[in-house]
Amino acid sequence: GVLQRVGVCFAAVGVLAIWSRAATQWTCLLLLLFGYAALLAAGGTLEPWHNLPSRVDTMLFGDMAYRYDTATGLGHDPEGLLSTLGALASTLIGLRAGALLRDGHPARLLPAAIVLLVLGALWSTWQPLNMNLWTPSYVLWTAGWALAALWLAHMLIDRMQWPPLGRRFGVNAITAYAGSGVTVLALLGTGGWGWLYGNVFD
């Protein structure tokens, strides 16, 4: 699940942030990107339900997988075990981006964003941008946009003193995510979901 993946990434990268140097973190990032890419390539196909991450989820979790097809005996989890390697790589890039800000080098964020976007686009010619598999190309592409957004937010809020309107959501991201799920369940249970789609979103 999403929260389980967030917890794993937070814990693993948190340990690296406290107990390792930058060189070790970069080495781990490269090993994750190229190691996961090699595993995906060795898996033979990236087709839904038949790719290596889905096969691993089926082998480990069986019919307890998030999605399980009883007809084929195949399982799939968009936040599965093997694809967490890609999510760990994304988290490590975030760690290094934060280090640029802490060390007083915010100007490097935008060039880094451009490099990541270019690398992600090039990598996607081999392995496509895919969120469910969290492919290495998806890691680089989304990290590029995230760094560009971080640079822009830093310039507008920290440098130009714009009001930090989204700060409450940023510092309470887990609460906001869980709250959105609770809200959906409440709307479904009270019939409000159908009313919204019939009267507001339609």
Please provide the spans of the model-predicted regions:
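Alpha-helical transmembrane segments and their immediate juxtamembrane cytosolic regions
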Residues: 1-202
